[in-house]
Amino acid sequence: MTQPPHPSRSASHLLPRGEKDGLSRRFMLGAPLALAACDRFATAQPAPGPLAAPLKDIVPAPFGTIGMTWQLDQQDWIEQVRRHCTQMTPEWEQKMERTLGPGFTYDFSASDRVVGFARDNGLRVHGHTLIWYSQGGEVFNDAVVPRARFATEYERYIRAFAGRYRGQMAGWDVVNEPVSEDGTGLRECHWSRALGMDGYMVRAFQIAKEADPDTVLFLNEYNLENIPQKGATFLKLVERLLKLGAPIEGIGTQSHLSIEIPDGNIRTFFRDAASLGLPIHVSELDFSLFRDGGRMPDLRSLKEKRAQQVARVGELAEAFHALPERQRYAFTTWGLRDQDSWLTREEGRNRPDDSPVLLDREGRGNPAYQAVVNAFTGRAGA
């Protein structure tokens, strides 16, 4: 399988979601518009100085970002990763689209490169992802594959991939995005049709644990804060799968935030999630200034959008900080600098004026960065 094109030429395969329609579900609003100008985070200002203080020294847990093979020879990116990060998640290199070929053949070479880079730079690695309904697995969709072989190849793939990095991964997203878009139920997919709605997840976790007993196994999902019903459905799923024997050991909340969700949604989800007692990973944090990534009309001023963004990111950081220390697995942004985010590089969207992560293009902290600093250092509202 060839190396993916650089995002400036093609990015359809880089989408962290399996978006096939014109709407970005990351920005579905699960509640009415809530302006945050009066929120105590809304007055946060950009961090002073030419470079932001290292996030790894501020976040009360491992701070991580994503990496792709084409970034591994970019010295400016490498310097920022070394400055800020203690963890790395492969953005695309461990998705089945890249690792599984015709005839159930494997190619883990791109994954090996990112894992090797992380190891060489003293970063721990969070694996992403073993089983997902999107971006790969077409060989399993072949109608001529007998069910018995389907189950055999499913287990063989998980065992081979997780076992390849036995003892090297801090954690794995074993199953990614099992809940339906609106949060009312579970997502039907080729895995559930062949192996059962709960069965495919239980078996994936069991095989992953056999292959790598010491890694922390996560169920990962998006829009858990944006859509309260989805958060509730997800947590009930975790409880049910645990009772069925799935060794789920962590909760991943992607936190692709709509900055317009009401004050309190994020705190409520984190409180409810913490009650399960499992480690929590803020696994894919970003927060576009634009509705639906710029596809929807938006008359708000930049000042209004920044105020909402700062308020929501600050709320998230406070909610994470409030967790017991043993439940703070990691805090990961989906891109380290604005230019690294899929939201600014996606073909057809490409909003260079967006600011969806914590560092700007020069590595300086933006207002959301300062909100995170304030939350983690107890200076919110100061």
Model-derived features with residue positions:
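Secretory targeting signals
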Residues: 1-9, 16, 21-23
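N-terminal secretory signal peptides and thylakoid transit peptides that target proteins
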Residues: 21-39
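C-terminal segment of N-terminal export signals and the immediately downstream linker at the start
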Residues: 21-22, 39-66
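Acidic-and-aromatic substrate-binding clefts and catalytic sites of carbohydrate-active enzymes
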Residues: 66-77, 96-109, 179-181, 224-233, ...
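Conserved, mostly hydrophobic/aromatic
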Residues: 88, 118, 172, 251, ...
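Substrate-binding cleft and catalytic face of glycoside hydrolase catalytic domains
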Residues: 89-93, 99, 113-194, 198-216, ...
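Aromatic-rich peripheral "rim/lid" segments of glycoside hydrolase catalytic domains that contact
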Residues: 173, 177-194, 265-272, 285-382
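Glycoside hydrolase catalytic-domain groove-lining segments
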Residues: 198-203, 212-216, 231-233, 240-296, ...
